[in-house]
Amino acid sequence: ILMMDYSLKSGENVLRASKEIANAAGADGMIGGQVVDILSEEKETLSEEELKYMHLKKTGELIRSSIVAGAILGEAKESDIEKLDIFGQKLGLAFQIKDDLLDVLGSVDKLGKNTNKDEDKNKSNFVTMYGIDRCEDLCKQLTEECISILNDLTVDAKYLKELTYNLLDREY
């Protein structure tokens, strides 16, 4: 009977995690963000709201949904899943801001790809919107907020903390 209960719960979690990722990939998630990105190529600049929406959906949903799905499959407490949802959004935004910084400040040798791609395509990004100093400050602020959320979980989040710091400190 206990194995049957576990099997049912495990199956429910797999379905819930799958739904989380599927929803994140759909029109209200990554696809929606990509549509905004494509449409933005016709505009000179994006508003701050459009830029955040695009990256929260395009990049952020990939990161957020992966973290939430992992928490679901790991049978985390519902309160922790809700906190990890917010953590994932903030981490996704920090990741994208850092990516925009690296596009301007990084080297081709370290990145393994061409830099200044957004500038070459005349695309809006966080650096063009806020400038380098503000973007660096935003990365640090979002990282601190992420760590604060992780400190508030009911489980040890050592590896997520390590990931968070690595994303801030990355050079590629």
Feature map (PLM): residue ranges:
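All-alpha prenyltransferase/terpene-synthase fold signal
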Residues: 1-172
